[in-house]
Each structure stands twice: as structure tokens, then as C-alpha cells.
Amino acid sequence: MPGEAPVEDYDPKEIEPKWRERWLEERKYRFEGGEDRPAFVIDTPPPYPTGELHMGHVLNWTYMDVVARYKRMCGYDVFFPQGWDCHGLPTEVKVEEIHGITKRDAPRREFRKLCEELTLENIRKMREQLIQLGCSIDWWTDCIDYENEELKELGSYVTMDPDYIRRSQYGFLELLEKGYAYREEHPVNWCPRCETAIAFAEVEYVTRETYLNYIEFPVADGDGSVTIATTRPELLPACVAVAVHPDDDRYSDLVGKKLVVPLHERFGDRDTPWEVPVIADEEVDPEFGTGIVMICTFGDKQDVAWVKRHDLPIVRAIDEQGKMTEVAGEFAGMEVEEARAAIVEALKEEGYLVKREKITQNVGVCWRCKTPIEILVKEQWFVKVRELAEDVKEAARKMVWIPEHMRKRLEDWTESMDWDWCISRQRIFATPIPVWYCKECGEVIPAEKDQLPVDPTRDDPPVDECPKCGCSEFEPETDVMDTWMDSSITPLVITGWPDEEPDLPVDLRPQGHDIIRTWLYYTTVRALVHADTEPFKEILINGMVFGEDGYKMSKSRGNVVEPTEVIEEYGADALRYWAVSSGAPGSDVQYMTKTIKRGYRFAKKIWNVCRLAKDHIDDAPSVEEVEGDLTPADRWILSKFHRLVDEVTEHLESGYRFNDAIKAIEEFAWEELADDYLEMAKLRLYRPEELGEGSREAARAVLRHVLDGLLRLLAPFMPFVTEELYYRLFDESVHDQAWPEASEKWIDEGVEEVGEILREIVTEVRKAKTDAGLRMGAEFEGLTVHVQDEELAESLEKAIPDLKSATRAKEVEVEVGEPKLERVPVKVEPRMDVIGPKYRELTRDIIEYVENNPDEVASAIKEDGKAKLEIDGEKVVLDEECVDVEWELRVKGGEGKAVEIRPGVVVEIRGLST
């Protein structure tokens, strides 16, 4: 295969599997870790193992793979690891669905084993898909000491392996030691479907229609009532106060009084009275509803703030399954939506419901299952992130953000946090929280670091008796950690922590903008706590992917396109082309089949160029060796190529502007190299006996030089086709080559100006051939280029072989001086549809006259706007509507078509005929 000419047709189905297999066999992209090259470390996102890559993955991994391949070519020893973020609720839900069970139906250990088996199967599928995409991942360098050999082959780390669990638990213990982790009873976001606490960063907000219910609250110990508007009447059993704005004159007399909670007779018993105080608070919005609000435990974050600020009691009206508790009386046991409807009906029956208004509101939902969240008071584990807010913002300023404006998302999120990070979850498939509790006094007994990993539900605590009270009985922690506790230590783990000092910041974090407030935020917190530094030097952000219909891809909309199907039809290079060309980093992009097809056509174009060039560039000399024989076209393409190297390098070095880089490469390869230069060089390559051996050698040298560099520039973006072609042309791997360097020696604006004139001349000849109905390769008599500038004339004289080759003119001349131009009619056609109705019986004679005297008629129309004739004694006037005249510019006295392509440059084309 090496050294062979590319076969006739480009077929990615033949090329890509071969190189995927070979790269794996050679362990081509393994990180060496030596002293001879600087390291470049990527903190690759560990995807959740769903079993299928989606187009968002394709976008993200293509971005990071382009960086990895580019940096290797720039001389870096690139560490491009791949981990897997295994734990989490979606796997538990899928296991329940597959096996027809719930987590309560199986022993804890067996349920976890089912989750691990499914995860292992999914990782294997996704690993193959990443390989299929052409990602130059290091599958051979382990970041953890695998205990499970079955997991070892799947990536650099797998978070469900015992050693990763050890590292995650180590981090928890360090947070506890440093005073950042704590446990307390506190309101938390709770998902009734998942039956677990979730962090604020895991709450999404969606717009939904609901009703604003206006409810009468009687005034206690007096006459009258006030109307309060609420969207959550089901929380009436948990109403502990009502609030007004202190400057709202409508309710100034109410402050200090009490109101009676409607329907309280139908609710259950509670420790706090059903007469609730009216308080004043500046955070009440006088414009919402009636300007008076009920404070319930808890409707939203604002309720939590008011309860804390005014030391109000807490009533638990909703349980962990999202059902009403006993305090709701006859409504107990109902799910929230059912209770809402029933209580509204009861309010209507009792005469408390004044009216209802349909409104839209933002509702917080679980980001996994989209169930509306509740705020419940639970004892949970937290990490103190609020006190690190300024440190996080300072760290964010030290990191380079691509694009820069994405930093504000992190800063805005940091400033918006009211609560600490809740890290405990009431699930099974996750890292166990490594603590026990004294059965007598509740003292927290953390594991020792040297006994990690531990599962408190199976393992014994590190002490025989409680250090506080002496009790010898302990209860295990059954909660597990938030999965972000696992993934937020990835830059630490890939640099050896906690067994070695972590080498932070790593060079690059590539990720989506949708997880800035989670993965990126939490990772920054952990790096600050565990390593006292920011985690990354650069952050490369990718956007979301939308379907061809303009909507976010989703199975419910039916607009999902599977990456594997695209690869099977068009190849991975075409899919990667879509990823890099569709938009700038950080921007949302649209999947477009036409872009995939363009990528395929571009690969095919490069293939065909190399196929044509193969026989001519073997053993070609260097451009320096043939410098004296270089034509203006040679120098033009060399200048354009070296300018391209500068441009593409700048795009990649200044913000990873992949879309600008691939656009520049494509325009050069397709338009300047393939469409123009090759046409200018073909005759020199194929007919050295006519144009000289030196001219042929120059063309061979230039073609080799440019193709060598072009394949290198394209290699990070389209690694398969470039590898195949580079091996066929140069018998080496393109991915082992250095990144091209631009040489100022070859960049010359004057040369480029001459080259553009050559292109314009060729374009005009092609147009003329098209108009004449000739094929592009047809030979014709000749062309003369008239120029006024002697220096330009000298350059064009040297370009005669280029022009002959590109135009197929038998003779090419260059003349200095300003030619005299004239417009001559080349087609004069009388219009019977206009002349007939106007002149009737004279029509035949008029047409005959025009056909016999075309120049006379055309000249008259040109000069006077009309031709005056006398036919059979009658006056006839023909204007532009009566006669179609097609003019052609010519050099006076010449026979060929002339075109003024720019001031001072006229091309005369002779002898074009069908």
C-alpha cells in the first residue's frame, strides 16, 4: 500500500477501518511521559455510559481530538485520557426497567451488580464509537490502579472501579478534615421521582402553564378577610405566616395581626397554630397577585429565606414520594397534583376561592427525569461552596476561556448561590459516603484513609467504640455521594492524586456550556481545596447540537441523527468536517446533512488531487533546488500556501477557531490548488518536451511541497483520508509529521497579485468557452494579454506556460501598451413578436433588412437609441425592444473577444468557435 497511487474512487468504508485497527495495534497515541518533549494534558470529559454517542459527543470529542492531534504535530507529548463517569440514577432506572424491579426489590449488593453489568456493556459500545470517530485517545495509560481487570481495557479510569472509589472517598475525607464538608438538617431540593436530594445545579427551569388561585384568609379575632394569590394551594397545610411589603399602605394595618388558614378544619393536626402571623418583609413583591403572600414550608427558595429570617416553624406537608403527609388531613396520601385539584375544589365549596387566573411560570424540575422538585427538610451532607465563591471567581479569571464570554456563566452562577452544595443522595449505584454514626449519641465516625475504599453497609468502622460516649454500636451511612463528587476530581486523578502531588493546572478542559455550573464549577472548587490552585490553563467550550428542523435533538421530536449511521454512509472524516465547520467554539450548531455531504466531497476532492499528483511527485526535487525555474503560478501557490499555514496556525493558537481554520484550508485546496494551480501546471507536467524539463521539475517540486504541507494542515481535522494519502504519497504517517511552518521567503504580495491576474484571465477564458459551447479542455487559437505596466508584463511573459496549460490556448502573447477597444455587435436578432403587431404587412421586409444589415442597425441603436429605416416608402423606427443586440468588446482591428479584467489589463481571446 505505501507508495501506491490512490485507487480511482475514494471509499471511507475501505480506508477508515484499516487505520483504526492499525493505530490501536501500534498504540500510536500513547503518552510517553518522558523528558524530551513538553507534556500537554487534556482533562477529557468522562461521559455517562448510556451506550450511544450522540451528536453533542461528536462535537465535543472532535474539538478535543483536533487539539490533541495539532499539539502532537507541534512537538508536544499529548496525554489524551478517556475516563467513564459510571454512577448515577439513569442506570438505576434502566436496570429497574430491564429487570422489572425497583431498588427495594433486590439486596443492595445485587442491585449494584446489575448496574455495573449494564454500565460495562454500555462503556464497551461507546469506546468502539469513539474509536470509530477517529479520536486519538490514549487507551493504554492508566490513571488509577485498577482492581477490576475487566475495566482496565476500557479507559484511563472508570469511576466504579474500587480504586477510583478510594480516591473519591479520600477527597470526601479531606473535605471533612479541612472543614468544608458538614452534615445538618436543612431544606434541600428533592426529586420525588428519584427519591433523592439534588443540588441546585441539577435543577432545571421550564416554563409551564398553571393557575394563580385567589384565596380568602379570614382575619383572626375580627371581621373581614384578605385575599392572597398562590399557585400552590396544596401547601395551605404548611402555611406558617403571610407577608406584606413594609411600604405597602394597603396592608399596613394588618402587620402584627393574625389570619386563619382556610380549610384548617379539614386538615390534620400540627404543632403550630392555624392562626398565622402577618409579617413585613422587603422581599415581598407588591405587584404580584394581591401583594400579600403566604409563607409555606416550603414552596420555593424564598420561603426558605423567610422562614430562616423570621424564625418561623417548619411544617412537613409533602413526603419523599411527593405525597401529602398526615398534616393534610383528608388530603393525606394524595400526590401533589391530585391534592392541588382537590384542595381547589374544597376551597370553592367552602367559599374561600375568589377566582383563578391562568399564568405561565418557571418551574424547577429534576434535570434527569424532569419531575417538579420539592423542597424538603432533610439531614444531608453538604460542601461549603459559598465561602469559596470569591476564590472560584479569582481562579476563573486565571484560566483562559474559549470563548471568553463563557466565564460570565460561571461568575453569575457563583454569585447566585444561596445554599451550599448538597452532596448526599438516597440511591445505591454511587460512591458510598465513608462514615458511620454512633447509635447512642450520633457522633460521626469517618473511615481511615488507609482502609479505603469502604462500604459502610458492609464494612466495620475503624473504631470499636465511640470516642465521644463510648458506645460500641454503630449505624452505617446508607446515603451515597453525588456523582459530581466523582467527576469533579478528574484533573486531580489524571495527574496522580492523592498518591502523588497533583500537577495542576492541566493544559485543557474541553466541555459543553450546559455543565459549566456543575462539572466546571465543582472541579474548580475541588482543585482549590485539594491542590490550592485553579484546575486548568484553558477551557474550551462547545455548544449544543440542534436538528435539521432547528430544534434541540430529541427522540420525542424525531430529529435525532445517530453518528454511527452517518459514519457508515459518509465516513468519520465527513462527520468530523461537520463538527469543525458548523460554528465557532461555544456556539450552538445545527446538524445539516448538506454539510456532511460537503465534507465527503471535500475528502474526495483531496483524494483526486493526490491521485493526479502521485505519478509526478515521486522523487521530486525541493522547491529550493528548482527556484530558478519557478513560474509566476508556482510562486503564487507557494505564497498562498505559506500564508495559509500562518492563517490556520493563528486560528488554532488564538481561540481554537476550528471553523475558520477548516474554511481556509478548504478554500485553498479546492479553489486555488485544485481549480487553478493544477490547471496551470498540467501541461508542464505532461508535456515537458514543449515547455522544458526545468519547468516540469519546478511544477513537480511545488506540487510535492504544497501537498505535503496541505495534508499536514488537514490531518487533525480529517485524520483518516490524510493518513491514507500521506502514506501513498510519502510512505510515512502524516500524524508523525511536524506541523508546517510558514516561510517568509515565499510569502510575497506582489507575486500573489500576479497570481490573481492569472486566475482572472483563466476565469474569463472558461466563461468564453462556456458561452461558445466548448469543453474546458478544448484548444483554441490563442490569447493576447495587453498590459500597461512593464514589470507586470515581464511577470506575465514568464507565466505563458501557466496560461497555456490552464486555458489550452495554442499561442499566448503579452503586449505592453493601452489597446484601443471597441464594442462590436456579434448577434443582431429582430423580434417578430414586437415588430409584427406594430408594422404587420411590412414585418417580413423589416426582418430581411435587419438580417442583411446587422452592423448598420446595431450601430444606429447604439448611437441614437433607434434605427430609422424606409421600407416600401414607409418610415420604420426600430429601438432596443424591436431588436436584440449582443455586443462584444474587441481590440480595434482585432478579431477576438476582449475583456478588461481590471484597469490596465485587457485579455483578447481569439479563435473560439464550436
Curated annotation (Swiss-Prot):
Motif interval(s): 'HIGH' region: 47-57
Keywords: Aminoacyl-tRNA synthetase, ATP-binding, Cytoplasm, Ligase, Nucleotide-binding, Protein biosynthesis
A Gene Ontology biological process term: valyl-tRNA aminoacylation
Reaction equation(s) it catalyzes: tRNA(Val) + L-valine + ATP = L-valyl-tRNA(Val) + AMP + diphosphate
InterPro entries: aa-tRNA-synth_I_CS (IPR001412), aa-tRNA-synth_Ia (IPR002300), Anticodon_Ia_Val (IPR033705), M/V/L/I-tRNA-synth_anticd-bd (IPR013155), Rossmann-like_a/b/a_fold (IPR014729), tRNAsynth_Ia_anticodon-bd (IPR009080), Val/Leu/Ile-tRNA-synth_edit (IPR009008), Valine-tRNA_ligase_type_2 (IPR022874)
E.C. designation(s): 6.1.1.9
Motif ('KMSKS' region): 552-556
Statement: the UniProt record of this protein carries the keyword Nucleotide-binding: yes
Localization (cell): Cytoplasm
Residue ranges of coiled coil: none
Source superkingdom: Archaea
GO cellular component term, pick one: cytosol
Keyword Lipoprotein: no
Family: Belongs to the class-I aminoacyl-tRNA synthetase family. ValS type 2 subfamily.
Domain notes: ValRS has two distinct active sites: one for aminoacylation and one for editing. The misactivated threonine is translocated from the active site to the editing site.
Function text: Catalyzes the attachment of valine to tRNA(Val). As ValRS can inadvertently accommodate and process structurally similar amino acids such as threonine, to avoid such errors, it has a 'posttransfer' editing activity that hydrolyzes mischarged Thr-tRNA(Val) in a tRNA-dependent manner.
Entry-linked HAMAP family: Val_tRNA_synth_type2
Protein name: Valine--tRNA ligase
Source species: Methanopyrus kandleri (strain AV19 / DSM 6324 / JCM 9639 / NBRC 100938)
Gene (name only): valS
